[in-house]
Each structure stands twice: as C-alpha cells, then as structure tokens.
Amino acid sequence: METAKGSFSLEVMDPDNISGWRDEDPYFGSEKRGKNIILYDWFAMTSKIDSVESLIDKIGFTSDVKFEDTYGFYGYKNRVMFDGMSIHYNHNQKSADYPLIEFTGQGCRDFETYTDGNWWRLFEMALDTENYHVTRLDVAFDDHDGIFDIRNMVMKTLNREYVSKTHKAQIVDSITREVDSWSLQFGVRQSDMYCRVYDKARERGYTDGRHWIRCETVFKDEYALNFIRNKLSLGEKYCGILKNYLRFVEPNKSDSNKRRWKTSKFWDKFLGNCNKVKLYTPKTVDYNLSLSLIHI
C-alpha cells in the first residue's frame, strides 16, 4: 500500500501490491481498517488475437481458479465465468466477435486476490491498441473518515452549488422499509465519462453505523485508454481528473458567477492542491485530406 504524497488526504492502493483486499468488507485486514483508498472497480477489454484459453493464461492466476460455462451477454453467445470475472465469446470468428474480458467490482477484487495483483499486466495489453481495445475502466474513492456528507452533497446539488463539465446531474432517492439513501450522478451513462457518489454501506445493508461513501468515476473507450496512458500515480491522476470535472462551491451573494465562488472545504480536503488532469484528446486534422478536398 502506498500513502499519497503531498496534500492528498487519502491512502492509495499501490496497483503492484494490493493482493488480499476484498471489497465486500471495508474493514478486512487490520492494516486497512478505516483507511480511505482508491481502487479499480470495473475493467473491460476486447482482444483481436486471443482465445478464451490464452486470455485466462494472460490474467496470470497464481492459484487454481475454475471458470464455469454460463449464458452469453452483450450479444455474445457464450461466456465463461468465475465469481466476478467473465470472458464473453462466440465460436464463430467474425470481426465483431472478439472475446471480451470483463471484471465487475468483485472481479477486480478477485484479480487482486488470485493473481499477484499487478494491474499493469492488463494495462500493457490495453496499450497495444492494434490488438486490444479497453471499453471500460471504473476507478473509485472509498471514504471511511467522514470527508463526504451525502445529505449535504445532495442539498448542494439541488441548490446548484457546484460547477461541472457536464450539464446534467441526477439525484436518486432510494426508500425501503428500513432506510432511505441517496445517490448522485454527474453526467449521463451514455457518455465517455461520468461520476457517481453513493452510500456504499447502505447499499451493502450495513446497519452498524459505519461510514462508507463511494465516489466512483466511469471511463469508457478513449477516456479509459487515456487514463491508463497517463503516467501520474493513481491518486494524482484520479484526483486531478475529478478536479477538472467537478467542484462543489460555497455561494456568494455578491457574485453571480459560480465559477468564482470558493471551493467547498470538504471538496478541497478530498482533492487538495493536485493539478487538474484532462483526458480528452482533440481530434487531429488530416491536412492532406483537407487539401485534396479543396481541389475537387
């Protein structure tokens, strides 16, 4: 485990040494009790060159893991699955039938538990864009220290006391007989990046009063690839991306421009003075094509 340097008020799991963390219990392991962490929480990638067997081999299991056949998904006819890890495939070899490796949140914990936990083994495959295409990467910050007050964040969102790159925010109020809980979403699911904040303890049904709020960001396609390409530490780039994407602010009645309002203290405590990180890559212009069109 690596403690974030500088102003970061959180602990970051070192992607090369995180074996043993299990997501279903945030208090698993005395050395991790009550720690704020950043972790990978979803990974999906297609391959042009692999079979199911070669993908399983490349995952690099260090203990016996048995994949079981199950029903297909996402238009694939077949799938093998172990806990939260799946490989979707078709028997016929068409260009659109490239096998898809997918880890859910639990699948990411399985990867860290049943291999040496080295995410860069998979990320180096993703960087080979001729043969692989990363379709989704989720990165989550788990707050166990009380940095986030979900009710306060809901109220600030309702009052539009935030500045964001996205034009859409959504508040979901889930009411059951025992509890009610809120979740926030900034951006839409169809976009290449969106952010969710929710009460993970309530979602898991814990009733012992523990504080576990998750801030989860979903990256797709080019955004996922650019996240992997960025050479900053996991904590620096995740916090930097959020700093560029979303900011909660304190209202100032004498200034109508929200962008000049001060950042809320809890958001500053979360992100500190990290530098903003942008994932968007402007499309380059093919000048040869442009010139040829001019002469048509």
Task: State where each predicted segment sits.
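Structured, helix-rich domain cores that form ligand/interaction pockets
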Residues: 1-287
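Catalytic cores of extracellular degradative/oxidative enzymes
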Residues: 290
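Conserved small/polar residues in nucleotide/adenosyl-binding loops
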Residues: 294-296
